[in-house]
Amino acid sequence: MIKVGIVGGSGYGAIELIRLLQTHPHVTIAHIYSHSKVDEPLKLTFPHLQHIMQHFEALTVDNNDCDVIFFATPAPVSKTCIPPLVEKGIHVIDLSGAFRIKNREIYEAYYKETAAAQDDLNHAIYSISEWQSFDNNGTKLISNPGCFPTATLLALHPLISEKIVDLSSIIIDAKTGVSGAGRSLSQRVHFSEMNENLSAYAIGNHKHKPEIEQYLSIIAGQDVSVIFTPHLVPMTRGILSTIYVKFSSEYTTESLHKLMTSYYANQPFVRIRDIGTFPTTKEVLGSNYCDIGIYVDETTQTAILVSVIDNLVKGASGQAIQNLNILYDFEVTTGLNQSPVYP
């Protein structure tokens, strides 16, 4: 059995890791770390986890017996705590943005904090699971993608890699539930501010914009810029990303649908919807699926892609476990076969 540790045990990402890893046949949760709740029983913070008798612990590097440690922490914590663990030879899967952006200046412009050391950035492997493979011996630090980038890049990847679109025309209109903001309180997630309300936020300066651009640029082999506008909607979970991009050659809904279904034919967690149907966030709730609906406006030769995920599962903890499966050469669906919760 692989011994796993979870850092940031009092946050939503960690809660999902605990929930999902309980059913993983090759994993045992050895330690749950939280610096603010050391020695407290897990069930005191999360009453729905009454059946788990573990207590929160303080993270240590010396004598740490974990094979893999998941970090579901803010980026500054990850930057400080992860390098010593990697140096010790422990595999780390980081759910924060600390190691996603390889250019330190760009990171600091968007995150408003000092970037990780360049050596650490160079060694971190950014992994959207559907297009990644690892060397178990050589890979020590996996940088899990953000939630908006996951939904967006999975939809755009086939079009960019096939070089069939105008790279200057990408517009991303994305909606997210409030759990994406974490458990910390702020005015914009207060019930009276959020309920019966819809708001755009972080226009032009959202942390996920350079992440999307960086990895689209890698796929395209040239610099790519996007227009990205996120919105906060009054629901707990879910991301719906509507993406508009113009073709550089003629396409129809049928021909694009054929391309997308072929591209993801062997990827169990990406479900391309039938022509004329479009996914909703509730249809992936609690699951590791990304569902994508496709339409081509043939008059303007514009693709309209609707991509939905659960931001806490495929957009965070589920994909982290998917990366664990790839790292250890397990069947990619291991521990992640949960159907969406509906209604």
Swiss-Prot record:
Domain of life of the organism encoding this protein: Bacteria
Gene field: argC
What Gene3D superfamilies does this protein's entry cite? Dihydrodipicolinate Reductase, domain 2 (3.30.360.10), NAD(P)-binding Rossmann-like Domain (3.40.50.720)
Indicate what this protein is called per its UniProt record: N-acetyl-gamma-glutamyl-phosphate reductase
The GO terms this record gives for MF are:
N-acetyl-gamma-glutamyl-phosphate reductase activity; NAD binding; NADP+ binding
Pathway(s) served = Amino-acid biosynthesis; L-arginine biosynthesis; N(2)-acetyl-L-ornithine from L-glutamate: step 3/4
Per its database record, what is this protein's job? Catalyzes the NADPH-dependent reduction of N-acetyl-5-glutamyl phosphate to yield N-acetyl-L-glutamate 5-semialdehyde.
Keyword annotations for this protein, in alphabetical order, are: Amino-acid biosynthesis, Arginine biosynthesis, Cytoplasm, NADP, Oxidoreductase
Q: Name one GO biological process term.
A: L-arginine biosynthetic process
Q: So what EC number does this one have?
A: 1.2.1.38
SUPFAM superfamilies from the UniProt entry: Glyceraldehyde-3-phosphate dehydrogenase-like, C-terminal domain (SSF55347), NAD(P)-binding Rossmann-fold domains (SSF51735)
- What does UniProt give as GO cellular component? cytoplasm
The catalytic site is made up of C147
Task: Provide the catalytic activity annotation.
Answer: N-acetyl-L-glutamate 5-semialdehyde + phosphate + NADP(+) = N-acetyl-L-glutamyl 5-phosphate + NADPH + H(+)
> Coiled coil: which residue ranges?
none
